[in-house]
């Protein structure tokens, strides 16, 4: 669980506004035992759930309703990046595979995109 503890600290720093301004709490943690370095975190507030995960090459964020189950399958969750592109009315860009970015940089890029648009994204899940 050491790897997940380190990842959790990074997520709490990179996405601090989710915890401090939008009342998200960490409610789920899973470290993949068969694949080194894989970690999945589940966040929740009164409106929705967010999964932030890392694999050996990817850091990503998915968002879903309160009834979506925290699991690697991500059933019931939607790509946070794709939803943000929809909100911003921009074409969804696939990552440039010529450049390798650390999971931390990938998550920081997502956070930079999410922060000014988080209210609109959360509105999609309000009843």
Label every PLM stretch briefly.
Residues 21:
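Extended, Lys/Arg-enriched charged tracts that mediate electrostatic binding to polyanionic substrates
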Residues 1-17, 26-127:
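Intrinsically disordered, low-complexity regulatory regions enriched in serine/threonine/proline
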């Amino acid at each position: 669980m050491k790897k997940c503890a380190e990842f959790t600290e990074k997520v709490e720093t990179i996405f601090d506004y989710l915890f401090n301004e939008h009342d998200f709490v960490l409610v789920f943690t899973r470290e993949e035992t068969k694949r080194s370095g894989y970690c999945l975190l589940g966040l929740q507030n009164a409106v929705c759930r967010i999964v932030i995960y890392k694999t050996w090459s990817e850091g990503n964020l998915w968002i879903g309703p309160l009834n979506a189950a925290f699991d690697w399958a991500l059933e019931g969750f939607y790509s946070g990046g794709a939803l943000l592109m929809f909100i911003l009315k921009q074409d969804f860009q696939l990552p440039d595979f010529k450049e390798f970015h650390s999971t931390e940089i990938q998550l920081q890029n997502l956070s930079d995109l999410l922060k000014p648009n988080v209210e609109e994204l959360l509105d999609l899940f309000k009843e």
